[in-house]
Structure formats: structure tokens, C-alpha cells
Amino acid sequence: MRPSRDDRDRDAYVSIPYTTAASEFLYGLNVVIAALKAKRRKMYKLYIHSRALTNPASAKTIRVLCKQANLKREDVDDSFLPKMDKMAQGRPHNGVILETSPLPTLPTKSLGKFGVTDMSIGIELAEQSAEEVQINGNPNSIPFHYTHTWRKPLVLLLDGILDPGNLGNILRTAHFYSVDAVAICTNTCAPVNLPVVQKAASGAAEALTILSIPGPANFITTCKKHGWIVHAAVAPNAASAMAGKKNLFTSSMISPLSRGPSILMIGAEGEGLRANLATKADANVGIRGVKPAIPELDVGVDSLNVGSSVAVLLEAFMRKPDNLEDVVKGTPREDDVAARIV
């Protein structure tokens, strides 16, 4: 139901308390708990309504995390709900809202060379303002999620993902598959710090390394010089039409992560990757569907949405080739296996 004129007039006069001009408000239990666990943001204040504490386990988790973070907590009643609604931009907040600094997103010019024994991924940062340095820091490397010995790093590059819900869903999928970093083209994608993106990601964005890419074409060119293998996600018919490119399909491909560090480029739903990025790929990757056996059931749905496509693609990239032995990190034979499969 649409808000009445009186409701809109009332909301216009509801003031929101900000600790800093750059403060953001995270809403929803899963997102707030994820942010408190990840500890990657500055935490200013937690607003919590009694209805958010009806689940004893959730209430205990919030109390423990607030104590660990030395976070100021304000218990509010129904009179504060108009402010909570405005903080959450009218979206469901479950009675819990966290005021924080923005999520770190590293403006990145290039990924560095990745050596056989490297446990992190070198990066070259673009210029940052003093305010950005306060949020992001000034690192020269990012973590490699070195859980299994058979694979090298995977970075997911997103171009043209304008829908905040799609972006959030992709971030959630990337976290599920332990992607090492998500690189977001800043001029063509929705802002990652939108609260609706964080909500759609269900807290997964808090655990991801996120790179902002101001110059994606130069980024890809330099990464290739540093030994990164670049793949473009394309429709199957587009893959076959691209002469001179190696064309892979998720159903039968051997993961390129067994050979070297890789970047997987994902384009906009419908339009796909921009040509200036697609032409830089070393190989194309497509997803083949299965045609209905009964012609009457073929209603013309011949593709997946971008979120579903990313899930299928990442499963293929993270699928260990059958001919490779794998040892989970921390076992005695880790170094021996790592040396043998590179």
C-alpha cells in the first residue's frame, strides 16, 4: 500500500542523526551481524528495537558482538520507528539498524604478478583522497583465499551491472564460491555501498575484497601483462561467432585456475560485455542450455539472468579437475602437492 499524503509529510520532517557526514545505515539482522563479525568498517551506533530481540540466539549474538566492538547500542521503542524507517529508506529493517563508515572498496589500477608460492595478490592502487585512505587504507596486496592447493586466484570483474538487487545477489554468490576479489567498474555499475545492495547480498559483501575499477580497459591490459588469464562470459551464439578466440563451455571446460590466476568478466544483462573489454579476453566462456524435447514447451526462454549465470560460471571455475590431487590447506603434504600441480 502506498503511503498517504500525511505519512509523506510526516516523513519529510523526520531528522536522522548522523555521527559523520559519510555515515551509512545498514539494516536487517543478517547484514548487521555480518558487518559486526567482519570488523572492516568503523562502527558508530546500533539502533535496536525490542522486536529484533525476540529470538534469544540472535539477541545473544548481538550483545556479544557489540561488547567485542565496544559499540554504543541504543534500545529504541515504537516512537523511534519513523526514524528507523527513514534510515532504511522505507525498506524492511527487522528493527535493527547499524550506523557505520562505508565499506572499503579499493580503487585499483592493476593486479600484480602472482608467483607459485604467493599467499597474497599484489595490487597497484589508483590515487585516493585522504577520506578514501581513512576508509580503505593503503594496502599493496589483498588476500588469496588459499583453501585448496590445486587452484590459483580468481577475480570476478563486473561491467554494466546497474540493478542494485542483481549486484547484491552476485556478491552473495561470489562469497559462496570463495572468489578472491570482486572488481567493479565504477562508471557502469550500481554503487556497491547502496544499502539495497548490502541487503540483497545478505551480509556477504562484508567478507569480500571489493576493488573499484575506474579504468577497466587499462586494468585488463596491465593484468594480462602480469600473467593473468582473462575470460569473457558470453552467450553461446556470441562465443561461436568470435573468430580467433578460444571458446569454452561450463559443462565441459577444465578450470583455468589450475593453470594460472584468472579474471572472469561479466557484462550487463541483455547487452553483455562492452566491446572494448570483450576483445581483450584470452577466451570466451558460455553456458549451454537444454532444449525442451517437446516443441510446444519451447517458449523462447533461451538464457539465464545475470545472477544465475554467475553461479553456473563460478561453479565451473571452482570445480577441481579430476586429474589433479588436492590437499586442504594446513595438511602435511600441502607444499609437495602445490609444487607438483603448478
Describe each PLM feature range.
Residues 45, 181, 282-283:
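Well-ordered beta-strand positions
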Residues 139-245, 326:
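RNA substrate-binding interface of SAM-dependent RNA methyltransferases
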Residues 232-302:
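Active-site/ligand-binding-proximal alpha/beta "capping" segment
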Residues 113-148, 242-246:
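Charged, glycine/proline-rich intrinsically disordered loops and linkers
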Residues 26, 73-77, 207-219, 285:
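Short acidic-hydrophobic, aromatic-tinged amphipathic segments that line or gate anion-handling sites
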